[in-house]
Amino acid sequence: MRAQPAASHFVDGRPLEDETGAPIPVIYPATGEEIARLHEATPAVIEAALASGARAQAAWAAMRPVERARILRRASDLIRAHNEELSLLETLDTGKPLQETLVADWASGADALEFFAGLAPVVTGETVPLGQDFVYTIREPLGLCVGIGAWNYPSQIACWKAAPALALGNAMVFKPSEVTPLGALKLAEILIEAGLPPGLFNVVQGRGAVGASLVTDSRVAKVSLTGSVPTGRRVYAAAAEGVRHVTMELGGKSPLIVFDDADLESAIGAAMLGNFYSAGQICSNGTRVFVQKGIKEAFLARLAERADAIRMGDPLDPEVQMGPLVSQAQLEKVLAYIEKARAEGGRLVCGGEASVSPGCYVQPTVFADVTDAMTLAREEVFGPVMAVLDFETEEEAIARANATDFGLAAGVFTADLTRAHRVVAQLQAGTCWINAYNLTPVEAPFGGVKLSGVGRENGRAAVQHYTQVKSVYVGMGPVDAPY
């Protein structure tokens, strides 16, 4: 099989196999070909990963931050040097076209490692003067962390979680999605090649039961999950039993508001990026596109032209712009949402069908005349299906944009920057864009509010989620006791 790794797991600095675990077939979604076969982590594999991580963490935390930074920077350089082959593997694992994976996946992971390498040596505490006494604070690592990844950006997510954890002196056991398990193994190999001591980044494969075993282990201090809201609820509850630190980056049903003074081509381009990039399988997608009534029909006409011109096909073809969904199960789910939208009265503007057999393809799809009550406007589809809703006033757009249990992201397109800032100040979302969409530089915090999650990834804000503060009171005089 063309993408078979050396072993299913990577523990304590080397590949580890245990073929008694349940098989995990890895399917290339463009063709249905089985490209690798892994095995689920057994209790022995899980124990080895947790034990080696706990054992290695103390010495790593004691290392000078600048030395930790050098290792992470070398890992970043190695990723960039091997970006082409890593991107090819990402395409086979996910079905995303090379046109995307070459610029968006491992490249973002390398950025994260480099950014947190630079941040590690400058994370400091503070001094609080109290007369002749004083208090100083120390930012300390949490200890052993568990990362649980999603299948849509498997390698990027692994890097986004590993980079701050390792830079700040923690160890991590990472469980990728069983749907896209290959990239995390490569990251583990790269980190060892860069000089990371064994045990600090371990990878174990498996489904929900493996994740549950990791999350509930008494040695684990922190859990970081990227996934769906139902999965997040379960993991959050399990982590709470041990009063563990958590970061949850969950689902979204994000609004993209287009006012009638917006640059139409830019707004349409953003709506397409926010619905069709990665075949629509992005948590922050702006899947509720609110368009002011005066420009709605012009917006839809031009959108249909551009959507129909998207090149679909073999993800390994560098000219292809959109690949398949990640799996047959996801394809069936998305097609069911399309049929539901038809049944509930949505006006199909373009797409709406499965495409390019035998892979898991669906056409870029746009529904107009969508109302807030329709399923398409309320539930996360996670496929290339855009809902276009119209509005009249700014106040109406804000109220309807916020009328959701999600709060991951939002976007505003307008030529009036005063209005843009006024609107985003009222949007209930963790990440907002003005005249742009779905750009997530590692220098900026990323995360949601409401059911879209807690905590933040990336930026300086991530430091708070992988460290804890110790306060030290220093008495400079005799103790004055009343007895």
From Swiss-Prot:
Lineage top rank: taxon: Bacteria
Cofactor: K(+)
Keyword rRNA-binding recorded: no
InterPro entries membership: Ald_DH/histidinol_DH (IPR016161), Ald_DH_C (IPR016163), Ald_DH_CS_CYS (IPR016160), Ald_DH_CS_GLU (IPR029510), Ald_DH_N (IPR016162), Aldehyde_DH_dom (IPR015590), BADH (IPR011264)
Gene behind the chain: betB
Cofactor comment text: Binds 2 potassium ions per subunit.
Protein name: Betaine aldehyde dehydrogenase
Classification via PANTHER family: ALDEHYDE DEHYDROGENASE-RELATED
KW Oxidoreductase (keyword) present: yes
Function, in words: Involved in the biosynthesis of the osmoprotectant glycine betaine. Catalyzes the irreversible oxidation of betaine aldehyde to the corresponding acid.
Keywords in alphabetical order: Metal-binding, NAD, NADP, Oxidation, Oxidoreductase, Potassium
Species of origin: Cereibacter sphaeroides (strain ATCC 17023 / DSM 158 / JCM 6121 / CCUG 31486 / LMG 2827 / NBRC 12203 / NCIMB 8253 / ATH 2.4.1.) (Rhodobacter sphaeroides)
Its EC number(s): 1.2.1.8
Transmembrane intervals: none
Modified residues (Cysteine sulfenic acid (-SOH)): C283
Pathway as given in its UniProt record: Amine and polyamine biosynthesis; betaine biosynthesis via choline pathway; betaine from betaine aldehyde: step 1/1
Active site, per annotation: K161 (charge relay system), E249 (proton acceptor), C283 (nucleophile), E457 (charge relay system)
Family: Belongs to the aldehyde dehydrogenase family.
Binding site for K(+) 2: V243, K450, G453
Residues annotated as binding K(+) 1: I27, D93, V179
Catalysis: reaction(s): betaine aldehyde + NAD(+) + H2O = glycine betaine + NADH + 2 H(+)
Molecular functions (GO terms): betaine-aldehyde dehydrogenase (NAD+) activity; metal ion binding
Assembly notes: Dimer of dimers.
Binding residues for NAD(+): G149, A150, W151, K175, P176, S177, E178, S228, V229, P230, T231, G251, C283, E380
SUPFAM superfamilies in UniProt: ALDH-like
A single GO BP: glycine betaine biosynthetic process from choline
